[in-house]
């Protein structure tokens, strides 16, 4: 059957959307956990938890959709990426488990709340760092021979992957801080605003470092970003990042509440766009394209029919949950 569109590209966009939705939605959840050690035990931590309590578990739906979509639609990529990145992926899942268990148990087990707070912060840190390391390892390249992973167990651990991991930790913390600026008031909001200002500078620095190194990882990255005439187009991305960072700084200094979080989301969108510019149309950079990794056309059609029903439902209940639980929160708002 002939279509006026490329099914494989459509699926690549669907999975990219799911991954981005997970990054920004669960990103501020993880950011709350990363900020937990600097929040005062008691009211501040309870308020921060209540700000994400109604939505945090639903946010992880997008991770399931992205991972499940990769397995179903791009099975070759799944078969190559998973063995290459077993360690950071397992670490991420363990971190998410610790974070989720601690989230609920700290309310039900007040005698050991301090221990659950440590588990919540530690799980958030491990999950965020592992996600960044996974991304960094994928960007730097995976050894492939034929249709299988050909590298070693520790190939994922490099200075670049650690840099990307640390950068994502800082970025998630920025999302968490701007979320608290939007959802809280009083002393906690003022404290979150101060942290957000510092984290803005740290995030921009991290983006600059990763962006400076990435073009030299592979020849195709260099060609995309620095070779003429491509640079005339791609140079707009770092320019927009600089403008977004300045707008974020201005709104934080100016006392805005919602704008900083929205601009921080825009900053993540720009970095995600930069990632797409670097790797598309590859799913394993420099090794496997989306067309080489794709499932048969019949499978893609069947799965797309299901996704066309499922994704609007997820978007609808997510939007409804955020609408119902909008507004300011306090230490007694949810649990």
Regions found by a protein language model. Give the residues of each.
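N-terminal signal-anchor module of multipass membrane proteins
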Residues: 1-58, 64-67
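Helix-coil boundary and interhelical linker segments in multi-pass alpha-helical membrane proteins
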Residues: 1-13, 71-86, 139-159
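Alpha-helical transmembrane segments
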Residues: 11-22, 82-94, 121-125, 155-169, ...
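Juxtamembrane membrane-water interface segments of multi-pass membrane proteins
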Residues: 30-54, 71-81, 104-114, 176-195, ...
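Membrane-interface helix-loop-helix modules in multi-pass inner-membrane proteins
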Residues: 55-126, 145, 224-232
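Transmembrane alpha-helical segments of integral membrane proteins
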Residues: 100-106, 277-290
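Long, contiguous internal "core" modules enriched in hydrophobic/ aromatic residues
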Residues: 105-260, 274
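Short, membrane-exposed interhelical loops at transmembrane-helix boundaries
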Residues: 284-303
């Amino acid at each position: 059957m002939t279509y006026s569109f490329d099914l494989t590209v459509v699926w690549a966009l669907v999975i990219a959307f799911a991954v981005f939705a997970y990054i920004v939605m669960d990103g501020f959840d993880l950011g709350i956990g990363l900020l937990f050690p600097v929040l005062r035990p008691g009211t501040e931590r309870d308020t921060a938890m209540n700000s994400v309590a109604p939505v945090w578990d639903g946010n992880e739906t997008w991770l399931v959709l992205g991972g499940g979509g990769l397995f179903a639609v791009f099975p070759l990529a799944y078969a190559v990426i998973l063995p290459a990145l077993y360690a950071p992926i397992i670490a991420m899942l363990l971190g998410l488990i610790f974070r989720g268990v601690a989230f609920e148990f700290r309310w039900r087990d007040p005698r050991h709340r301090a221990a659950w707070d440590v588990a919540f912060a530690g799980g958030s840190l491990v999950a965020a760092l592992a996600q960044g390391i996974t991304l960094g390892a994928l960007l730097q390249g995976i050894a492939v021979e034929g249709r299988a992973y050909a590298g070693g167990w520790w190939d994922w651990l490099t200075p670049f992957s650690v840099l990307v991991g640390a950068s994502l930790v800082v970025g998630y913390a920025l999302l968490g801080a701007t979320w608290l600026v939007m959802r809280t008031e009083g002393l906690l909001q003022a404290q979150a605003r101060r942290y957000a200002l510092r984290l803005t500078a740290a995030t921009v620095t991290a983006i600059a470092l990763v962006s400076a190194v990435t073009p030299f990882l592979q020849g195709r990255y260099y060609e995309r970003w620095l070779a003429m005439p491509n640079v005339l187009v791609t140079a707009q991305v770092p320019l927009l990042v600089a403008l977004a960072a300045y707008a974020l700084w201005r709104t934080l200094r100016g006392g805005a509440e919602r704008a900083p979080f929205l601009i921080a989301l825009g900053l993540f969108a720009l970095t995600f766009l930069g990632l797409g510019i670097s790797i598309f149309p590859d799913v394993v950079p420099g090794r496997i394209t989306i067309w080489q990794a794709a499932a048969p056309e019949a499978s893609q059609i069947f799965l797309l029919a299901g996704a066309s029903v499922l994704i609007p439902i997820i978007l609808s209940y997510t939007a409804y949950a955020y609408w119902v639980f909008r507004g300011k929160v306090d230490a007694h708002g949810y649990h």
